[in-house]
From Swiss-Prot:
SUPFAM superfamilies: EF-hand, Mitochondrial carrier
Keywords: Antiport, Calcium, Membrane, Metal-binding, Mitochondrion, Mitochondrion inner membrane, Repeat, Transmembrane, Transmembrane helix, Transport
Region C-terminal transmembrane transporter domain, annotated ranges: 165-468
Function: Electroneutral antiporter that mediates the transport of adenine nucleotides through the inner mitochondrial membrane. Originally identified as an ATP-magnesium/inorganic phosphate antiporter, it also acts as a broad specificity adenyl nucleotide antiporter. By regulating the mitochondrial matrix adenine nucleotide pool could adapt to changing cellular energetic demands and indirectly regulate adenine nucleotide-dependent metabolic pathways. Also acts as a regulator of mitochondrial calcium uptake and can probably transport trace amounts of other divalent metal cations in complex with ATP.
Protein name according to UniProt: Mitochondrial adenyl nucleotide antiporter SLC25A23
Membrane topology, Mitochondrial matrix segments: 207-243, 301-336, 398-436
Gene it is expressed from: SLC25A23
Length: 468
């Protein structure tokens, strides 16, 4: 077979690809040239893990690059693996992958995608406009991406079109059976928890300012952003801007773990005989999981608010704060504001999910002519906008919750129920009163998302989670 016409054609094609990648014409392709080639030929942001994997796998003598012989040997093995993947996805063995076969393959992995999403995926590889993918199109699209099996290919597609971020991740992440079996799921949860801790610490002054304005700002006490920061610094110094951050970080781990376990159980109950959850069912499961987690860790939310608002020397620490609340107000105090908190999950989760899906599908319709991958900036922008819309809808309930958590610690203040507090705010301050502190809340969204993303990606790399 070595001298066959097909073999000669392949070697010519590999030679042309090698020449195109070898930008400095030194007879070798290094990681830098490979990175440029992946970006140029793949039509999207290349995966650093794929570049390193290709170099280490193909380089027989580890000298930092591939010569033509090593490059050709790698591509030959690569094409053989890709051909097996192609046949695995081509369920009716007609030599083409169509939209229904893409959907079936996703369903087999427990991932539900719409017909429109499947068409967008197919369109990103379909060069001849036939709305099917033949072997040549498949090979050319995936030749330089380090994808080892069908699950990897499907997750390359999934992660290029789906990213769901929210302020508190009200609807938990979906993990495939493969991710659960390999242990990638807990590594991603750990990476997310560390990212959340760093992000919350970085934006803690704005978070404390928000709580401060929610509780203390009014028509008679017109607190603005600078005035609020100044009064906090004058009362307790620069370090006081981070009051309440310790418990805010501490509650990430139990909340994430409980939410994930509850979501898996609720999802199993909803699924029944179905293979996958629809978006509406995912919203219901996510909201119930969020409510379950909040029910269990809610005393930590009350402690966070009290510690955030404390005066210098008021409490010796977390345990002292909890002991004093228990002695003076009883155990019920640890669930003050619970009802508006749980009710706030529904508008936040629903609007966050709906706006994100709308923005994502709009972008895919308008701009995904050559690729279904919008890039990380577009995905982060969609996530930020959807999260902000969710916050606007649920903010009045969040404000009422915070006031109820804090009102027992304010001397001479009225002890009101949720409806009583809503009526009091509306009668005294109007609708604007329900949005006190929303400015610093908006100010922290972009830095929080940015810090979270950077730390999350670095943590995934450190933990050995493959990015696709």
């Amino acid at each position: 077979m070595r001298g066959s016409p097909g073999d000669a054609e392949r070697r010519q094609r590999w030679g042309r690809l090698f020449e195109e990648l070898d930008s400095n014409k030194d007879g070798r392709v290094d990681v830098h040239e490979l990175r440029q080639g992946l970006a140029r030929l793949g039509g999207g942001n290349p995966d650093p893990g794929a570049q390193q994997g290709i170099s280490s796998e193909g380089d027989a003598d580890p000298d930092g690059g591939l010569d033509l012989e090593e490059f050709s040997r790698y591509l030959q093995e690569r094409e053989q693996r890709l051909l097996l993947m192609f046949h695995s996805l081509d369920r009716n063995q007609d030599g083409h992958i169509d939209v229904s076969e893409i959907q079936q393959s996703f369903r087999a992995l427990g991932i539900s995608i719409s017909l429109e999403q499947a068409e967008k995926i197919l369109h990103s590889m379909d060069r001849d406009g036939t709305m099917t993918i033949d072997w040549q199109e498949w090979r050319d699209h995936f030749l330089l991406h380090s994808l080892e099996n069908v699950e990897d290919v499907l997750y390359f597609w999934k992660h290029s079109t789906v990213l769901d971020i929210g302020e508190c991740l009200t609807v938990p992440d979906e993990f495939s059976k493969q991710e659960k079996l390999t242990g990638m799921w807990w590594k991603q949860l750990v990476a997310g928890a560390v990212a959340g801790a760093v992000s919350r610490t970085g934006t803690a002054p704005l978070d404390r300012l928000k709580v401060f304005m929610q509780v203390h700002a009014s028509k008679t006490n017109r607190l603005n952003i600078l005035g609020g920061l100044r009064s906090m610094v004058l009362e307790g110094g620069i370090r006081s801007l981070w009051r309440g951050n310790g418990i805010n970080v501490l509650k990430i781990a139990p909340e994430s773990a409980i939410k994930f376990m509850a979501y898996e159980q609720i999802k199993r109950a909803i699924l029944g005989q179905q293979e996958t959850l629809h978006v509406q069912e995912r919203f219901v499961a996510g909201s119930l999981a969020g409510a379950t987690a909040q029910t269990i860790i809610y005393p930590m939310e009350v402690l966070k608010t009290r510690l955030t608002l404390r005066r210098t020397g008021q409490y010796k620490g977390l345990l002292d704060c909890a002991r004093r609340i228990l002695e003076r107000e009883g155990p019920r105090a640890f669930y003050r504001g619970y009802l508006p908190n749980v009710l706030g999950i529904i508008p936040y989760a629903g609007i966050d999910l709906a706006v994100y899906e709308t923005l994502k599908n709009w972008w895919l319709q308008q701009y995904s002519h050559d690729s279904a991958d919008p890039g990380i900036l577009v995905l982060l922008a969609c996530g930020t906008i959807s999260s902000t819309c969710g916050q606007i809808a649920s903010y009045p309930l969040a404000l009422v919750r915070t006031r109820m958590q804090a009102q027992a610690s304010i001397e001479g203040g009225p002890q009101l129920s949720m409806l009583g507090l809503l009526r009091h705010i509306l009668s005294q301050e109007g609708m604007r009163g329900l949005y006190r502190g929303i400015a610093p809340n908006f100010m922290k969204v972009i830095p929080a998302v940015s810090i979270s993303y950077v730390v999350y990606e670095n943590m995934k790399q450190a933990l050995g989670v493959t990015s696709r």
